């Protein structure tokens, strides 16, 4: 057992990890070299508790359409990035639209496991990213359309981490 009780509180988190560029805004480039940092720096839509039950994280709730092809995720209000702006549905959309258009090496996960509509066609350039089956309905609502019924989709999204679009526009991979 490791105890951190003798370590003084700090507003700064220091951690050891590995990255493709030395920053962690690039985690959507390669999942295999991200060293678990997204889990420390951002929050997925869902997660699993110690008994492997699916539980909410950023999403306070989710529902599936009657035909099983559309999922709606409602984000918890009041979540913010460390620099102050609110976490928005568009930050999750930005993460996946960036992934699908940059050759993300874990793309099969969102294509096969998640079955996101048009993932492969957008990834290979035969369809525009605007046709990807994800959208921000409003600041707190994400809608996902799948190619086929995926009853386990909320569990798949335990690995969907947002990217702060406002920070990305300012800093990029740097």
Positions of predicted regions on the chain:
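Extracytoplasmic
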Residues: 10-12, 40, 57-59, 66-70, ...
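Extracytoplasmic/secreted proteins, especially bacterial periplasmic and envelope-associated proteins
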Residues: 36, 40, 53, 57, ...
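Solvent-exposed loop/turn segments at secondary-structure junctions
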Residues: 20-23, 52, 78-80, 99, ...
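Surface-exposed binding/hinge segments that line
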Residues: 74, 91, 100-101, 105-169
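N-terminal lobe/hinge region of extracytoplasmic solute-binding protein
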Residues: 16-66, 97
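Short, well-ordered beta-strand elements
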Residues: 2-4, 11-20, 70-73, 92-95, ...
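Aromatic- and charge-enriched surface segment that lines or borders ligand/interaction sites
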Residues: 60-108, 143
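Second-shell loop/turn segments in exported
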Residues: 27-32, 75-83, 130-132
